[in-house]
């Protein structure tokens, strides 16, 4: 019995789900592949900022702009970022399971080495404390959303990149992307 090609492809890209409609069709689970991740690993340095994007997810729809999330590379293959579970340290390989990733170096620092070291130390301390996620995006509390964490660890370097969204000033991932405080080192948008 010969199985049609379309059926093999369809069943290979369809995932079972525990709620209706019971199936999810994802022909490309993640577009950033092994070769892309190798280039990221060869490029990234401690203190670099990474942005990522997932296609087809609700949070991507609700986050204005192309990029949806930010983290800081702290060395030892670890990214620190703020997620709904709090501020965490995660393996860079897990962070890069996405549909697009961009790596930036921070530029125009007056004392680059000590400022980057301080940013890394602040990020690691936030992860060690597992600082809560800032669900109200107020900036007036001791919790962080992803890009706010990046701004705080770099001593409010991105203050000029906030935009008014949802009735308050918010640093969007695209704000970091367009900032004069960073330089793109690598962009993977397969």
What role is predicted for each listed range?
Residues 1-190:
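Cysteine-nucleophile amide-bond enzymes
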């Amino acid at each position: 019995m010969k199985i049609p090609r379309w059926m093999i492809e369809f069943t290979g890209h369809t995932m079972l789900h525990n709620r209706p409609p019971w199936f999810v069709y994802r022909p490309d689970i993640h577009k950033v592949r092994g070769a892309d991740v190798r280039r990221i690993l060869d490029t990234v340095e401690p203190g670099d900022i990474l942005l990522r994007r997932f296609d087809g997810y609700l949070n991507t729809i609700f986050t204005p702009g192309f990029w949806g999330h930010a983290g800081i590379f702290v060395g030892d293959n670890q990214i620190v970022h703020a997620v709904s579970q709090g501020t965490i340290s995660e393996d860079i390989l897990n962070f890069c399971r996405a549909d697009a990733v961009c790596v930036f170096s921070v530029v125009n620092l007056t004392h680059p080495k000590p400022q980057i070291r301080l940013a890394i130390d602040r990020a690691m301390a936030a992860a060690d404390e597992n600082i809560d996620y800032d669900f109200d995006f107020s900036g007036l509390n001791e919790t962080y959303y992803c890009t706010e964490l990046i701004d705080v660890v770099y001593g409010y370097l991105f203050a000029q990149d906030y935009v008014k969204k949802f009735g308050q000033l918010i640093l969007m991932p695209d704000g970091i992307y367009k900032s004069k405080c960073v330089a793109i080192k690598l962009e993977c948008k397969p």
